[in-house]
From Swiss-Prot:
Taxonomic classification: Bacteria, Pseudomonadati, Thermodesulfobacteriota, Desulfuromonadia, Geobacterales
Protein location: Cytoplasm
Reactions catalysed, as given in the entry: L-homoserine + acetyl-CoA = O-acetyl-L-homoserine + CoA
Protein's name according to its UniProt entry: Homoserine O-acetyltransferase
Keyword field: Acyltransferase, Amino-acid biosynthesis, Cytoplasm, Methionine biosynthesis, Transferase
Gene source species: Geotalea uraniireducens (strain Rf4)
Record-annotated disulphide pairs: none
Encoding gene per record: metXA
Superkingdom of the organism of origin: Bacteria
Top-level enzyme category: transferase
Enzyme active site: 150, 311, 344
Length: 370
């Protein structure tokens, strides 16, 4: 079963948020969706945090005519992993994004114009502090769990270290304690693609800089896949539409990247892409601490980690560093390495594999809370 027709909600907070940079952002609007019902004890809420270019549309459809359901529709609904007959599921669009929450494309109330590059640099920790405003607004003192993959996993880690008293558990998939130099360099090249598009106009564009953003998305998309998955899907097949010896003839993988890149332009804002890429690069769960050990000493709730064998963006060794650190500290931690050909995107695609493990973990958390 599915959650059916859903609606996007939003709330605006008049309070100003002091960011990690020291700058102030406010008022803040957050777009979000909820599924299921909050129980009388307000103890069954699970926050699902989205990745870089995701949004609050986690599951269901806005109308019968919507072509695709929410981005993790397979795990949300009656009888599914995130069972809406048991849990109250929340997903909020992060600040800095472009799907209804305050970001660079929003109107700055002080000027009446779009923020564009006057928008402050934000961090994953800032995103979580904004989420905390929403959780307070919903009247929830303590989340049963926070779950997310990639940048969503970073948010879950921030909840576990910055607000340990407010979560009963965390589920972290395909993430890292800090992006590597290689990951940062790939984001840098993606940024250059946008910067060097003359229609970007230093962020003051009226229409999305389509060529730069499409190229940036193509670079990013490669990092989400694996050699194995790309070989299986495309191999070295040349496009049937192009002549093999045409100068501009393309392999199927080239056509795929172009198609996805230019489709992306229609749904995502270039400045938001840049700001969230910066937030990813700046991420370090140990920011403000002397070490990872000191950061993880704050953890109180059990954390379940998943890594995927072919993920070369945030490889398993980076998850294992976190698991080992938590184990040394005597913290409750569980780790699963899943063999998968899907690369970094495996956290979205291997739900049938990890569902029984997550379900068992949540049952243990529930039993321990009794």
């Amino acid at each position: 079963m599915t959650v059916g027709i859903v609606e996007e909600k939003s709330v605006t907070f008049d309070t100003e948020l002091r960011l990690e940079s020291g700058r102030i952002l406010g008022p803040i609007t957050l777009a979000y969706e909820t599924y299921g019902e909050l129980n009388a004890a307000r103890s069954n809420a699970i926050l699902v945090a989205h990745a870089w270019t995701g949004n609050a549309h986690l599951a269901g459809r806005y109308s019968e005519n919507e072509q695709k359901p929410g981005w993790w529709n397979e795990i949300v609904g009656p009888g599914k992993l995130l069972d809406t007959d048991r849990y109250f599921i929340i997903c909020a669009n992060v600040i800095g994004s472009c799907f209804g929450s305050t970001g660079p494309a929003s109107i700055n109330p002080k000027t009446g114009k779009k923020y564009n590059l006057s928008f402050p640099v934000i961090t994953v920790r800032d995103m979580v502090r904004a989420q905390q405003l929403l959780i307070d607004h919903l009247g929830i003192d303590r989340l049963f769990s926070v779950m997310g993959g990639s940048m969503g996993g970073m948010q879950a880690l921030e909840w576990a270290t910055q607000f340990p008293e407010r979560i009963a558990s965390a589920i972290v998939l395909a993430t890292t304690p800090r992006p590597s130099a290689q990951a940062i360099s790939l984001n840098a090249v993606a940024r250059w693609a946008i910067f060097n598009d003359p229609t970007w106009k230093k962020g003051e564009y009226r229409k999305n800089p389509k060529d730069g953003l499409a190229l940036a998305r193509g670079i990013g998309h490669i990092t989400f896949l694996s050699d194995e998955s790309m070989t299986a899907k495309f191999g070295r097949r040349f496009s049937a539409r192009d002549g093999q010896f045409d100068f501009f003839g393309r392999f199927e993988v080239e056509r795929y990247l172009s198609y996805n890149g230019y489709n992306f332009v229609d749904r995502f804002d270039a400045n938001s892409f840049l700001y969230l890429a910066k937030a990813l690069d700046l991420y370090d769960v140990a920011w403000g601490y002397e070490s990872l050990e000191e950061a993880f000493a704050q953890v109180a709730a059990p954390i379940q980690f998943f890594a995927f064998s072919s993920d070369w963006l945030y490889p398993p060794a980076q998850t294992e560093e976190m698991v080992t650190t938590l184990e040394k500290l005597g913290k409750p931690v569980e780790y699963h390495l899943i063999t998968s050909a899907y690369g970094h995107d495996a956290f979205l695609l291997e739900h049938e594999t990890f569902t029984p493990m997550v379900r068992a973990f949540l049952e243990k958390v529930k039993t321990a809370a009794k």
